[in-house]
Regions:
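Formylglycine-dependent sulfatase
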Residues: 2-16, 21-381
Length: 381
């Protein structure tokens, strides 16, 4: 991660210095090439397995594939720390966690006084902005404009912290809202005399994978294939056996699979109630109308053992895929905007995630163990 991040920092900043000599007919003249704009899209927990330009077994991601088709797809991109805040700190600084000081999500506050990628870009003449997830505790530095979600953010009716340190609520689904704000900044708020670098940072596809309402029924008829090692026994691997990421044992029946009933309890039930409590009354009716038949069927069947593990896996995969669908839509909106404005050929579009994720491999979800599915991340530009 250090090698990739630091070299990327310098290569992005270096575009401001690019010049080219062109010829037109018989007349030769030197023209200064405008520095490339940069749109850096980062998502949370989006694993390469769930992008069709990397893996065709699961879903189609046509807009993400557009970036790969017209650019470069990195097949060996790995993070230095597969945890949201620490991974982002590595990205911005080009330093490993022990060197940048942000080693975990619970006790650390990012030191914004150190050198970062956006600061280098500012020095190179860029206008910089970040919109969406920040997750570094301190307020952003090195940005001319920012508006960030507090903590993990809310999928529904999301809250944002403004540059005035006010917390406001915006209407809609977070992935759409972040894109709306990003397009508005590019169209109406930036200095159009300067090159820009916009970091579009999504909460998606972070746990607990709450879908956009229009996609609630998507993938419900799809049966996702089980990974070959779904029933891993962890023989000879005590550390792996001790992990608390088991789909069967650790995936919360209410918070993660949405099998919510007031007379049932789970460790994360209250958090789930807070999340879906952000829906408007008319939205909650749509949400409940979809999940209530699933809930009734689940508690009637009351699956156990392998049947429960595979049922949880299918619910997990379907909800995760639905959130990816909204994300892919919004990547398409950004690409379409740049194309419509005649900016696409002069803009470097980067898409990546802060880490990978287990999609049932080793019987797991989450990312907190150092196997490839956790450390490997998609990177296209």
């Amino acid at each position: 991660m250090k090698k990739i991040s630091s070299s990327l920092c310098w290569s992005l900043a270096g575009t401001a210095l690019a010049v080219s000599a062109t010829s037109c007919g018989s007349q030769k003249k030197e023209t200064v090439q405008k520095p490339y704009n940069i749109v850096y899209i980062m998502t949370d927990d989006h694993t390469a397995q769930m992008m069709s330009c990397y893996d065709t077994r699961y879903i189609e991601t046509p807009n993400l594939d557009r970036i790969a088709r017209d650019g470069v797809r990195f097949t060996n991109s790995f993070v230095a720390n597969s945890l949201s805040g620490p991974s982002r700190a590595c990205l911005f600084t080009g330093k490993h966690s022990h060197a940048n000081g942000f080693t975990d999500n619970t006790t650390c506050v990012f030191d914004g006084s150190q050198q970062t990628m956006p600061k280098l870009l500012q020095k190179a003449g860029y206008e910089t902005a970040v919109i969406g997830k920040w997750h570094l505790e301190s307020l952003p530095t090195g940005f001319d404009y920012w508006e960030i979600v507090p903590g993990q953010g809310d999928y529904y009716q999301p809250r944002f912290i403004t540059m005035n340190n006010d917390t406001i609520t915006k209407d809609g689904y977070l992935t759409n809202v972040i894109t709306d704000m990003s397009l508005d900044w590019m169209e109406n708020q930036r200095n159009k005399e300067k090159p820009f670098c916009l970091f579009i940072h999504h909460k998606a596809i972070h746990r607990n994978w709450l879908p956009e309402l229009k996609y609630l029924s998507l993938y419900e008829d799809k049966t996702f294939p089980l990974p070959d090692n779904f029933y891993d026994t962890y023989e000879g691997r005590e550390a792996a056996a001790a992990q608390e990421m088991s789909i069967l044992q650790d995936m919360d029946i209410i918070y993660d699979t949405k099998m919510y009933r007031k007379d049932k309890d789970s460790r994360l039930k209250a958090t789930y109630e807070d999340y879906i409590g952000r829906l408007k009354p008319e939205e909650r009716k749509i949400y409940d109308a979809f999940y209530e038949p699933l809930i009734e069927e689940f508690y009637k069947k009351n699956p156990k053992g392998k049947e429960l593990a595979e049922w949880k896996y299918q619910r997990y995969m379907r909800d995760y895929a639905k959130v990816v669908k909204s994300l892919d839509d919004n990547v398409g909106r950004v690409l379409d905007y740049l194309e419509e404005k005649g900016m696409l050929d002069n803009t470097l579009v980067v898409y990546t995630s802060d880490q990978g994720f287990y999609m049932g491999e080793h019987g797991w979800f989450d990312k907190r163990f150092m196997y490839e599915e956790s450390m490997r991340t998609p990177l296209v530009m």
